[in-house]
């Protein structure tokens, strides 16, 4: 990134996105922070996102949007719980108080409102605030990106796609970060199963910028959902040099790479990626995305019969401190995978019990509201599966199978729970569950023809003589 290209006060105003500060340095550092967020990359030459935020707040300690982006990025990282992190709770409270005492533009006030909503677990209201900004300011990349992430956490695939469709025509290829706008739109297309168009738009973005890790990520999803394993392997290998520099998405792209190997039954190759990339990057970053990917990968391998207990124990050191965060159900479910895999009964029990407590008095937090009817029974199903009570796991998961989107994430990420339901049904001693497993596999084969993983499971079902 070229620091000379970052916008000062006048440049932001010229773009119709005025910032309430007189500090040109603060404006440029805000732009640098936003650019790194949009590109999934901490640029060491700029000091990374944390360095830019620190310098920005020193340049103008009263810059409301500087504090808004700082709190917003920490919150969407989902690694800090407002209930447990007094410093973060204080930052959000000070942001709201600071905004109330200053003369801000309506756009800036909506940004503060969005951050406050998100902080309190009102994710839908947060997205509404960012969408309100985009009605008048369709080139506000911060609002675009925060809404995109918000919809992702909500599992709202169509709004995630349409949010980008509404603003894309206001941009041109000459505007900085345009390729990343295309890549976000391509991901929305992929998640709404428009695979041909998703691949086309993503590759247009990659042609403009081979280092667009999010565009590469969309193509990886397309190959996964089509069960095009060899094409996926070839694509990831041919584009690795571009996206491996995107430190905030690189581990996730390696995770996608590993899924192709798991699908093909090439477990040693998958474990090599886990050891050399996924786990290494997870330990280095402490990022929730990297963490949940590592959890999911081991859980999938274990369901395939691979012994990964030692790796679970190593990963537990990363996930255990977040046992009681309960920021996202998606995170909780993945942390439980590792606690169960590492045979840490106390940690597993504490995670489920504290989630149950929040579900009983959720307040306005959407994740806690969803916990009672979705998150907690999914956790209980995983515990039942771990204890060998496969019939109970089926009975808990079966009524929820069309509601899994509510935990957020992508189709590819949530597929681990569909696999769990199939494995539970196959292992249940009840014939009706085994017949249900066969039906699930017929569905799976129709949705993703030529899946080697599905074929292996069908062979297992056939061996039961259902």
Where are these regions (language model features)?
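Inter-helical turn/loop elements of alpha-helical hairpins
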Residues: 22, 27, 35-54, 58-105, ...
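Structural motif corresponding to the intra-repeat A-B loop/turn of tetratricopeptide repeats
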Residues: 39-40, 77, 120-121, 154, ...
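Single-residue signature of alpha-solenoid repeat helices
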Residues: 45-49, 88, 126, 160, ...
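Solenoid-like repeat scaffolds
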Residues: 54-60, 96-102, 131-138, 166-175, ...
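TPR alpha-solenoid repeat register
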Residues: 66, 109, 142-143, 177, ...
């Amino acid at each position: 990134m070229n620091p000379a290209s970052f916008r000062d006060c006048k440049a932001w105003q010229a773009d119709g996105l005025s910032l309430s500060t007189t500090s040109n340095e603060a404006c440029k550092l805000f732009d640098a922070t936003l650019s790194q967020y949009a590109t999934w990359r901490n640029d060491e030459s700029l000091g990374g996102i944390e360095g830019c935020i620190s310098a920005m707040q020193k340049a103008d300690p009263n810059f409301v949007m500087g504090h808004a982006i700082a709190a917003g990025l920490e919150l969407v990282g989902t690694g800090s719980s407002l209930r447990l992190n007094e410093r973060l709770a204080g930052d959000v409270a000070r942001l709201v108080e600071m905004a109330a005492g200053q003369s801000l533009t309506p756009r800036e006030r909506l940004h503060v409102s969005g951050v406050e909503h998100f902080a309190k677990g009102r994710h839908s209201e947060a997205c509404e605030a960012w969408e309100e900004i985009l009605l008048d300011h369709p080139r506000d990349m911060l609002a675009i990106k925060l809404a995109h992430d918000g919809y992702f956490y909500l599992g709202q695939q169509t709004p995630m796609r349409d949010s980008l469709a509404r603003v894309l025509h206001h941009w041109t290829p000459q505007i900085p970060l345009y390729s990343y706008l295309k890549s976000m739109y391509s991901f929305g297309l992929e998640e709404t199963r428009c695979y041909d168009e998703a691949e086309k738009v993503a590759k247009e973005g990659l042609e403009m910028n081979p280092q667009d890790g999010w565009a590469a990520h969309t193509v990886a999803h397309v190959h996964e959902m089509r069960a095009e394993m060899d094409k996926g392997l070839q694509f990831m290998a041919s584009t690795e040099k571009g996206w491996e520099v995107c430190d905030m998405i690189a581990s996730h792209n390696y995770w996608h790479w590993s899924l192709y190997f798991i699908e093909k039954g090439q477990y040693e190759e998958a474990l090599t990626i886990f050891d050399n990339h996924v786990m290494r990057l997870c330990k280095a970053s402490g990022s929730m995305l990297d963490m949940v990917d590592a959890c999911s990968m081991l859980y999938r391998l274990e369901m395939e019969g691979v012994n990964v207990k030692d790796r679970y124990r190593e990963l537990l050191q990363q996930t255990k401190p977040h046992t009681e965060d309960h920021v996202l159900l998606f995170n909780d479910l993945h942390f439980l995978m590792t606690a169960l895999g590492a045979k840490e009964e106390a940690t597993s029990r504490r995670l489920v019990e504290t989630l149950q407590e929040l579900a009983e008095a959720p307040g306005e937090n959407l994740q806690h509201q969803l916990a009672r009817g979705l998150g907690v029974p999914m956790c209980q199903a995983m515990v039942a599966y771990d204890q060998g009570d496969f019939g109970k796991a089926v009975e808990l998961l079966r009524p929820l199978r069309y509601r899994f989107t509510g935990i957020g994430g992508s189709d590819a990420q949530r597929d681990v729970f569909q696999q769990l339901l199939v494995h539970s049904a196959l292992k249940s001693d009840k014939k009706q569950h085994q017949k249900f497993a066969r039906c699930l596999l017929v569905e799976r084969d129709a949705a993703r023809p030529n899946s080697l993983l599905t074929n292996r499971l069908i062979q297992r079902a056939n061996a039961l003589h259902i």
